Amino acid sequence: MQAITLEAVKRETGKSAARRLKNQGYVPAIMYGKDMTENIPLAVEYTKLQKLLQKYGRNVLLNVVVNGTTHTALIKEIQEDTLKGKIIHVDFQRVSMYEEIEATVPLRFEGIGLIESKGGIVQHQLWELTVESLPDKIPQEIVVDLSHLEIGDTLFVKDIPVPEGVKVLDDPEEIVVSILVPKEAGEEEEEEGEGTAEG
């Protein structure tokens, strides 16, 4: 994963400073992590951050440039205004390129349409995996192909292939997806079975 450059500026703290930043088109942020003695309050341009997230997702390796100094970092947390759907704060975690870290990676499911065409219902139990790897090995997403599954099948964490150098920390026996028979069809089969037994 190639690091993407994002410029940031140091900011003042406090509510009035936060309002001023917002009016200027910035979103407050903070950086903490590897070899840092104190957290750095930052601000980044809202539109640039939004475009970056839309293009690369949240699991993007960043070169955060602050006053000419480059910090290798990941986005650790994003706070959003759920009503307005806007980002209100970002946490950057500075990392070492030579030390493994934990990250949460979303799952993208393919083949759902094929299962539904067979009459199956896809029941999701897990939408993301917790992984451990070097920062540049963290995938933006993990693709899960469901097209080979049949009604009644179950997909576990251990069944999901991940890139080389990535270790999954979730329980291998945890269920990710189950393929269910439609409820009505199941009820009809039960009723037919009962009718046969009575006859």
Swiss-Prot record:
Belongs to the bacterial ribosomal protein bL25 family. CTC subfamily. This is Large ribosomal subunit protein bL25. The keyword S-adenosyl-L-methionine does not apply. One of its GO terms (cellular component) is cytosolic large ribosomal subunit. GO terms for biological process: translation. InterPro entries: Rbsml_bL25/Gln-tRNA_synth_N (IPR020056), Ribosomal_bL25/Gln-tRNA_synth (IPR011035), Ribosomal_bL25_b-dom (IPR020057), Ribosomal_bL25_C (IPR037121), Ribosomal_bL25_long (IPR001021), Ribosomal_L25_dom (IPR029751), Ribosomal_uL5_bac-type (IPR020930). One of its GO terms (molecular function) is 5S rRNA binding. Part of the 50S ribosomal subunit; part of the 5S rRNA/L5/L18/L25 subcomplex. Contacts the 5S rRNA. Binds to the 5S rRNA independently of L5 and L18. It holds the Pfam family Ribosomal_TL5_C. NCBIfam families: bL25_bact_ctc (TIGR00731), PRK05618.4-4 (NF004141). The gene is rplY. This is one of the proteins that binds to the 5S RNA in the ribosome where it forms part of the central protuberance. It comes from Caldanaerobacter subterraneus subsp. tengcongensis (strain DSM 15242 / JCM 11007 / NBRC 100824 / MB4). Keywords: Ribonucleoprotein, Ribosomal protein, RNA-binding, rRNA-binding. CDD domains: Ribosomal_L25_TL5_CTC. SUPFAM superfamilies: Ribosomal protein L25-like (SSF50715).
